[in-house]
Structure formats: structure tokens, C-alpha cells
Regions:
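N-terminal secretory signal peptides and thylakoid transit peptides that target proteins
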Residues: 1-17
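N-proximal helix/coil linker or "cap" segments that precede and/or mark the start of modular domains
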Residues: 31-67
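A short beta-strand-turn-helix
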Residues: 69-89
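Short active-site neighborhood of thiol/selenol oxidoreductases, capturing the structured segment around
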Residues: 82-102, 110
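Conserved helix-turn-beta segment immediately C-terminal to the redox Cys motif
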Residues: 107-128
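Thiol-based oxidoreductase modules, predominantly thioredoxin-like and allied folds used
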Residues: 124-136, 154-163
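Short, internal strand/loop/helix patches
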Residues: 144-189
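Thiol-/selenol-based redox modules, centered on thioredoxin-like
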Residues: 182-224
């Protein structure tokens, strides 16, 4: 499968705070006053800004980052938000072990990204792939997939209850508007979502974009 053009990937990689509007609304509400002597041009205080940021982050967590129970390729039990995402920079995508469509190509491309990022993976960045077929992919199958594709440390493959995986997929936006296509797992979305959770910076890119461009975009999120 050919790499996606640089022009297209740059258009899809535009970064923005996932809840910028929430932060603005929170700050506005915290600093507005109807009293005649209130200074309309006064800047919001540091405590107000911090409170607004925390409120926005919590709204994002509740709506998009469900704290479901998962198991990685080493049979370790983890919670999605508390253990995998909170206070971290992450990449997120979906696959399944016996996929004959986009999965092998995306995995191979992300292995290139992992190598480009070097020892930052597992330290400054954590990579997560979630199976779309938890009824088939247990920890043993995920471990085999990891070894087969040369996936290195800092990249976890995860499974769990089917209902939890589906909740996670929908919450993270890996869906098609057409329900007939959306339920066909062989046509699943091959995108990568990446973000800086504490800073509320989230974006996405095609999984087959040029590995160097993906690595550069992720590095920008790490530095933010």
C-alpha cells in the first residue's frame, strides 16, 4: 500500500486543544462579574485558569476516555484512563490479529515510527493498540502478534470485554457514520490518534502516512 501524500497528511494532522472551547468558557465564567465596579479588562487569575483547565480536562475524561478494564499481551490487568492515558503522551489505534486488510501495513508503518522515536517510546510516549476482536485475541494471541511484527518495548497490545472495547472505540471516535460499514470490522478505520492528555492536545493521522511525518508530529506533542 503506498504512503499517503504529504499534503494530505499535513491537512489531517492539525493540532488543537481537544477542549479549547471548554477552557475558554470556564475561564470566562470564572472571571465575569456583573458588579459596576468590576474591571472588565482584568486578566483571569492563576487559580481561575487552573480551575478552568481542570474542569475541561475532567469533561474530556468523562466523555472520551472511559476507564475500562483491559489486559495487555503479558496478561497484565490495566485501566484505560488511570494506567494507560492519565498524565501521558500516547498513540491509540485499533486492529485485530487475523486482519488481512489495513492492519499489517499500519502495524509495519508504526514499527518504523517506533524505531524513529527510539528510547522515547516507553519513557516520553506510550503506544497502545486495541483489538477489535477480543473474542479471538487474548493475551497469547497478542503476544504472538507482537513477536511476529517486531513490536518493541513501550507499545502495548490490549484486549478486554467486547462491550468495553466497543465503548472505547466509539468514545475515541474510530467510527464511520454509515452503520453498515461501521459494523464491518474488516473495513475498520486505520487512523492513529495521538495526544498529550494533561495538556488536552489531541489529533489524528492516517496510519499509512509517511513514518517520518508521523514521528515528527508526535514529537511536537511531546515537546508541547
Amino acid at each position: 500500500m503506498p504512503d499517503i501524500s504529504r499534503r494530505r497528511v499535513l491537512g489531517l494532522m492539525g493540532l488543537a486543544p481537544a477542549a479549547g472551547g471548554l477552557v475558554s468558557a470556564g475561564v470566562s465564567g470564572a472571571t465575569r462579574s456583573d458588579k459596576p465596579d468590576a474591571k472588565s479588562d482584568s486578566a483571569p487569575s492563576a487559580p481561575d485558569l487552573l480551575a478552568a483547565s481542570r474542569a475541561a480536562r475532567e469533561k474530556i475524561r468523562l466523555k472520551y476516555l472511559p476507564n475500562v478494564t483491559l489486559y495487555n499481551q503479558d496478561k497484565k490487568r490495566v485501566l484505560f484512563y488511570d494506567d494507560l492515558v492519565k498524565n501521558k503522551v500516547v498513540t491509540l489505534n485499533f486492529f485485530y490479529a487475523k486482519c488481512e486488510g489495513v492492519c499489517p501495513a499500519v502495524t509495519a508503518n508504526m514499527v518504523k515510527v517506533q524505531k524513529l522515536l527510539g528510547n522515547r517510546v516507553g519513557r516520553d510516549l506510550f503506544m497502545y493498540s486495541f483489538t477489535l476482536k477480543p473474542e479471538e485475541d487474548g493475551p497469547a494471541e497478542l503476544k504472538e502478534y507482537q513477536e511476529m511484527h517486531g513490536i518493541g518495548p513501550g507499545w502495548s497490545l490490549l484486549t478486554g470485554k467486547a462491550a468495553d472495547i466497543e465503548l472505547l472505540r466509539k468514545s475515541l471516535g474510530f467510527t464511520y457514520p454509515d452503520p453498515r460499514i461501521d459494523k464491518d470490522k474488516s473495513q475498520h478505520i486505520g487512523n492513529i490518534r495521538y495526544g498529550n492528555e494533561p495538556l488536552m492536545l489531541w489529533s489524528a493521522c492516517p496510519g499509512m502516512a509517511h513514518a517520518q511525518w508521523i514521528a515528527e508530529s508526535i514529537s511536537w506533542v511531546i515537546r508541547s
